[in-house]
């Protein structure tokens, strides 16, 4: 059978179970290490038996809601390729916007930075590579996630120190900047989560108690004691959480400015705590 015909057959079945059809060709090309041109040229060729087996394997995993990034074992973030598996969340494009904002609003001056809930290490490592003179620390409550983040730092030659901690329980600071993309989905909103996310990605990194606000509340309680006077806090939030998270941090930092910023899709996505000037 021609590759194009086999892909079309599998893609139709993936759509029927609510998966994105493009994930199949994306994963296949990645595992074959093909360019897009290689892929296009192969569409009208017969599929070798070995490749039929590979395609079937990818299809079966996608059909059972395994994300394509887990199948290929990597995800791109801020121009870098990170190893990902079931130990960590797959980095999202929205989080790239958070990193870009931090780099845009903070110049080359050396800062002490903490990434809370680092997961794959995507935020901390991307910042470390862009600002090599900053002192970057990254924490997570999951030892498995920290192990993978450490692997990513080594692979990408980023200088980041990793620490096991539940938010700031085992951290002392002082820090000039805290960034976090914490678990923020309420357990009541489980129906809003995609099937592949729910089936494969770690729930510890997805869901938070107290309607999704538990980690924000803990950061707001603990951060004032470990931050320098000029320090800033950058948070990713759920699209419905802007007002509540802003209120939490305005109470925790009454003398600072708290901003809610939108992502590229026009949804509330980031909260920034600083001394003003923006």
Regions found by a protein language model. Give the residues of each.
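A general structural signal for well-ordered alpha-helical segments in protein cores
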Residues: 7, 24-27, 55, 68, ...
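Alpha-helical elements of Rossmann-like donor-binding domains used by nucleotide-donor carbohydrate transfer enzymes
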Residues: 9, 26, 54-57, 97, ...
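An acidic site on a long C-lobe helix of protein kinase domains
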Residues: 51, 91-94, 215
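A secondary-structure boundary/capping signal
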Residues: 43, 73, 85-86, 164, ...
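SAM-dependent Rossmann-like transferase core, predominantly class I methyltransferases
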Residues: 57-131, 136-151, 272
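S-adenosylmethionine
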Residues: 133-135, 139-276
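N-terminal auxiliary segments of SAM/dcSAM-dependent transferases
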Residues: 1-72
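Alpha-helical structural context
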Residues: 30-31, 105, 130, 252
